[in-house]
Amino acid sequence: MAEVLIRKTDYDYQQLKPAFFEIVEKLAGDKIKSGQRVLIKPNLLSFATPEDAILTHPLVIKAAVEYVLEKGARPQVSDSPAIGSFERIVKMNKINVALKGLDVICSPFKNTVMLDIGKPYGKIEIARDAAEANVIINLPKLKTHTQMLLTLAVKNMFGCVVGFKKSQWHMRAGTDTDAFARLLIAIHQAVKPTVSILDG
């Protein structure tokens, strides 16, 4: 059975950090070991500022990085934006400022591997960093979505499909919401994030 924790805080880092640490420690603290590669997967869809509330807030990402570092593991923040360059999005969303001075890799997904996500989809190209990470911390952003109504933890793993391959899978599903939902579930189950912390 899935375990769910809810904590209310604002983006004051003195409040956010202990709340975030508490959640991750309770849900996945025993799964993050010293020396492991930990992928932190935020939602970095497109150009936006923290105030736009479209992307995972930079301080949520910072809390994840600091938690991983405290565990002695190796954090990497990555995504594959649908629109625009990863570097510009990181700068516009002030992630570069939040992560300044921290020992973390912050880079877009590039290399891919083929991952079997089951019938009827078969093998799909997934970011190598996601496929080979020891631990994945999924950091989705709570927001509306034209086709799926909401973007939550399951859909955020679709970002592990690199570059324009995402739009190709969107087109294959067309307007069939159920077909696209099944695809999202298949990808989520294949990539298997260790823990999901929803930035709402």
Question: What do these predicted ranges mean?
Answer:
Residues M1-G200:
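N-terminal and secondary-structure boundary signal
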